[in-house]
Amino acid sequence: MNHSTISADIISFTSLGQKDKREIEQKIQYLLEHLAQQYSSIHFYGRIVQGDTIECAMTSPTYALRVALLLKTYIKSIELSEQTEKDNRVKYFKEYGIRAAIAVAPLSVFDDMNGIIDGEAIYMSGRAIKHMSTSNKQKIVVKDTLFFRSKNEEEQEKFESIFSLLDAIISKCSQKQSEVLFYKLSGLNEKEI
């Protein structure tokens, strides 16, 4: 049975000030808890590992893209302190937020109650992110930030095109536009926003 996983890393996280890092971690943790409640029917589980890496898993791939876009738009909508804004690399955080990979494949172990995720899906999404990482590099070059991985090559090719288009559109969104997108993806209408 195919599950869906999302592996993501926060772009330019090491360039952020300590206060901003802690605030972002807290806000992401809050979002992951909210998503666990909202998507409890598909056993959504999300966690932050190594400070700037996010891992999520769910029993159904149906909502994987929505969850990835919720993460991306939510993180892009976070305001940073003025001190952090002065760092040149922070512009990458503001433009892209996170780099995320969705994988649809089996998981050999998925125990959301104990936080255990193991299997092909988490390896595929994790490798996609690790392969595209910009950490420990002198110059940051970010081309794409949304990826799809599947054992089915035909399926992967179809989704990669869609993901590239979504990536280009969302990367152009401002902080406020990202916030509005987040609320729309959360199911709110214009009046509620």
PLM features: residue spans?
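Regulatory and interdomain segments flanking nucleotide-handling catalytic cores
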Residues: 1-192
